[in-house]
């Protein structure tokens, strides 16, 4: 809290007055970061796109976000602080991973309903897609075993995941 107050140019009392506790500060930080990915996956931006283009857009935004230094730092904080603040982990999961999965599953459900892709379980298909995107990349980045991926590296990984996904769940 001292560092945050110093960087913000305010007193520690001001930080506590605004957030109430370290847990609330972490929760606000997590919520702000999670909103960024949710906004980038806004459903209206996906409608009207061919399925391959929509999945590519989702994949690039998701992987870029997930592997960004800010997201990695927040993830590390959440993992390290959740034993002391269990609600932080729950709030992080609800605002981030669960929300993102829900948005993607709803997109896939609508696309399947319009006959644009063949699948019968949008939630399971979403898990498959995200699993192909994440693979070992996230853990390796969190552990510092791999440098940041370039835009070209992200694009190649996403294109491969989309190709594999559309083999499992073809478009007509």
Set out the residue ranges of the language-model regions.
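Helix-turn-helix
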Residues: 1-24, 28-32
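Residue-level preference for short helical/loop micro-motifs built around acidic side chains
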Residues: 3, 23-28, 36, 53, ...
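Hydrophobic/aromatic residues within well-ordered alpha-helical segments
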Residues: 22, 29, 33, 55-58, ...
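Amphipathic alpha-helical linker/stalk segments
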Residues: 27-58, 64-66, 70, 109
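Helix-loop "lid/cap" segments that line or gate small-molecule binding pockets
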Residues: 45, 60-67, 74-83, 164, ...
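C-terminal peripheral helix-coil segments that are non-catalytic and often amphipathic
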Residues: 53, 57, 61, 102, ...
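Amphipathic alpha-helical packing segments from all-alpha helical-bundle domains
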Residues: 53, 64-65, 69-73, 77-79, ...
């Amino acid at each position: 809290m001292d560092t945050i107050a110093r960087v913000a140019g305010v007193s520690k009392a001001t930080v506590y007055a605004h957030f109430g506790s370290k847990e609330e500060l972490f929760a606000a930080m997590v919520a702000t970061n999670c909103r960024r990915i949710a906004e980038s996956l806004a459903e209206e931006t996906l409608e009207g796109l061919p399925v391959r283009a929509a999945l590519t857009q989702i994949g690039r935004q998701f992987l870029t976000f997930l592997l960004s230094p800010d997201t990695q730092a927040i993830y590390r904080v959440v993992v390290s602080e959740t034993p002391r603040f269990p609600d932080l982990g729950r709030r992080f999961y609800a605002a981030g991973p669960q929300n993102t999965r829900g948005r993607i599953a709803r997109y896939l459900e609508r696309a399947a309903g319009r006959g644009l892709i063949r699948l019968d379980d949008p939630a399971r298909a979403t898990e498959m897609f995200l699993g192909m995107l994440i693979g070992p990349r996230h853990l390796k980045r969190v552990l510092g075993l791999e440098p940041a991926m370039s835009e070209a590296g992200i694009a190649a990984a996403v294109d491969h995941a989309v190709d594999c996904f559309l083999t499992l769940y073809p478009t007509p």
